Amino acid sequence: MLLLVTSLLLCELPHPAFLLIPEKSDLRTVAPASSLNVRFDSRTMNLSWDCQENTTFSKCFLTDKKNRVVEPRLSNNECSCTFREICLHEGVTFEVHVNTSQRGFQQKLLYPNSGREGTAAQNFSCFIYNADLMNCTWARGPTAPRDVQYFLYIRNSKRRREIRCPYYIQDSGTHVGCHLDNLSGLTSRNYFLVNGTSREIGIQFFDSLLDTKKIERFNPPSNVTVRCNTTHCLVRWKQPRTYQKLSYLDFQYQLDVHRKNTQPGTENLLINVSGDLENRYNFPSSEPRAKHSVKIRAADVRILNWSSWSEAIEFGSDDGNLGSVYIYVLLIVGTLVCGIVLGFLFKRFLRIQRLFPPVPQIKDKLNDNHEVEDEIIWEEFTPEEGKGYREEVLTVKEIT
């Protein structure tokens, strides 16, 4: 019994060789891949990750739903990148690639537009007017709940300043527009974000990039004047004030010279005039001229988003419209004068006949034959040349 116990104890003791030689395994040990901890800040549009030691290469890019790739420039020692010209409301995928002297790292980050589909603001648009004011409008999403509320945020291209809407336009208590009377914080290109909130469900956001040159609506030209001489008319106007800093070469104008009292359906030809230092247009118009009106509108020569028409300026005279009427009046007056003259002559002729009636002809009572000539031409009975009249005597004897 003692021998059995002793043998069992000896079997449980570790083998001396096991204590001196480390255990070897046939399976290769693989270290778990460390995460780059990629993160994205939508306010600054900055994508960042944890820096790795001995980095030899790194890049970042995004892919949208249309498989378009945007890759900003990045140096090897940077651990972040910033995206400037992107919209996120359709959902994007960020991806970071980093290589070190020992291994490579890759990580993706999905950035979806969380919330119920169709709850985001729709039909978003903005326009600048009067050089200092801007209106933005949008519509409620078709699947948005009744208690939805939208909020507008604007960031300039440098992402250094965020503008919140100061004055909202409401429809049944829901924000559907925004009015801004101070545009000092805007740059040439700006990022617009419309967020939504609701107690019932999540609301998707909408974002857009807008260029101030494309959304500005010019005021019509001012100080429009027209001066005419006997043969020409000269139109002058003043360049409209704009939010952008533009020279006269950046403008294109259209003139609508319209003649008054024309037949309905008559189309007027629009006259295109390039911007000029003096802003003038000279066209032939001889006197007498009918009454006309002229109005002008302006646009950026690169975009041609036309302004409204200026107030119509009239020139010419209503008497000018009688140019063609004069002909008809002269014809009528001439006809009347001729009629009066003819009537006067006719009456005078009647008076003359009354004063000097015609002498009646002597009637031939012996011969009622009307075929006999009333007038005898004695020349027909001229004697023969060299002969005189001969008298013949006829003697009549009475026989018993």
Curated annotation (Swiss-Prot):
Supply the gene name: CSF2RA
Supply any other comment. Answer: The gene coding for this protein is located in the pseudoautosomal region 1 (PAR1) of X and Y chromosomes.
Concerning its family, UniProt says: Belongs to the type I cytokine receptor family. Type 5 subfamily.
Q: From the record, give the cysteines joined by S-S bonds.
A: C126-C136, C165-C178
Origin organism lineage: Eukaryota, Metazoa, Chordata, Craniata, Vertebrata
Q: What is this protein called?
A: Granulocyte-macrophage colony-stimulating factor receptor subunit alpha
Query: Main subcellular localization, coarse class?
Result: membrane
Q: In the record, which residues are listed under signal peptide?
A: 1-22
Xref: Pfam families: IL3Ra_N (PF18611), IL6Ra-bind (PF09240)
InterPro entries in the record: FN3_dom, FN3_sf, Ig-like_fold, IL3Ra_N, Short_hematopoietin_rcpt_2_CS, TypeI_recpt_CBD
Looking at the UniProt entry, the stretches that span the membrane are: 321-346
Task: List the Extracellular topological domains.
Answer: 23-320
What quaternary structure, including any partners, is listed in this protein's UniProt entry? Heterodimer of an alpha and a beta subunit. The beta subunit is common to the IL3, IL5 and GM-CSF receptors. The signaling GM-CSF receptor complex is a dodecamer of two head-to-head hexamers of two alpha, two beta, and two ligand subunits.
Q: Which organism is it from?
A: Homo sapiens
Q: Which PROSITE patterns match?
A: FN3, HEMATOPO_REC_S_F2
Q: Which residues lie on this side of the membrane: Cytoplasmic?
A: 347-400
